[in-house]
Amino acid sequence: MAHPRNSRRYQDFDMDNTAQLADAVNAAIAVGKTIVPKGGGSKSHYRVELAESVTIDTSNHEGIVHYHPDELVVRVRAGTKISTLNAVLAESGQYLPAEPPDYDGLATIGGAIASGLSGSGRPYWGGLKDYVLGIKLILPSGEVANFGGDVMKNVAGYDLSRLQVGAMGSLGLILDIALKILPKPLLVKYFKVHCRREDVVSMLANFGQMPGLTGLKYFDSQILVRLSGSAEAVAQAEHLLPVERAPANITDFQKGAIDQLQPSQQLWRWDGQPAAPLEQPGLVAMDWGGALRWLDADSSQLKSVDSSQMTFVKTGSLPRPHLQTRQDGVGRLQNRIKAALDPEGHFIDYPALRLYS
């Protein structure tokens, strides 16, 4: 059953602050302050503080604008907690397959869109951008605009909605997002298998061919496997696992995720081929079947690693390293898009997160 926008189930967190946020953006533009969007603050470690800037907080701009379970579409305000959205969807047996990290309940859906982070199901279900249907935001001109829509099949043209995914708040202030959602799998089971470090790449490659696989990780000398589907399909896939497998649960599976890791030195993200050798120093966890790796290392230890594959996340006991923006083709494209959509530089630039020698 579709639930209307103002039904009682949503009233306790239904806050529309569009007018106030638009006023705040236009006031900052008028005095020449750089605008820094903020949601739950769970990803503030990506940025450094800027002089002559103003932070505009969207965390009170929250609630479900509308939710139509039969149509597999939900529109949600940017300040809504991911945990809240997940709970609402679960009541109808649905979920957001991109699984953006919720940082122990702090993360908002607007921050998830801005960061573009997706969970362990990324290789199997797609990333967050694949589930964005439409976005309402405040442009660098100060205008409120809508892009995309609330239907699966959208009009042709350049998709400014998905362009916001991973833009880190550099292209405008997100107000609300229309998302495609899916029914939850009939059955989900988790398993863990002990693995020596020297065997992890080959074991991940072997497990990666399994049917029903929706998550494949490595953490704390264990390979963590998630299988999803019908009871029959999951049972068949389970028999392909080694006999020494042990049952696990969702808490076990979530260990080693970006929102759970606390580095002693500096936390870095490595993206590459799953079969790449374990030559990166400070490896603490792997995801996406080995294509995503988390390193706890000093930047001085990473000189031998291809810098185009490394992204800074946050620091532990060490100071923040000297970082640069992307210098490759993607970086140049980011700069061109920023110049086209925010020529006056009213919103913050994409953060410098790359380490170049």
Predicted regions and their residues:
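C-terminal substrate-binding/cap subdomain adjacent to the FAD-binding core in PCMH-type
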Residues: 114, 133-264
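Short cationic amphipathic helices and targeting signals
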Residues: 12-13, 74-76, 189-194, 221-240, ...
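Short beta-strand
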Residues: 37, 214-220, 284-288
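Short, conserved charged micro-motifs
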Residues: 83-85, 198-203, 231-239, 275-281, ...
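Basic, alpha-helical nucleic-acid-binding regions used in initiation and control of genome expression
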Residues: 45
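Conserved glycine-rich FAD pyrophosphate-binding loop
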Residues: 49-51, 59, 104, 244-357
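N-terminal glycine-rich flavin-associated loop
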Residues: 7-37, 58-104, 117-150, 185-193, ...
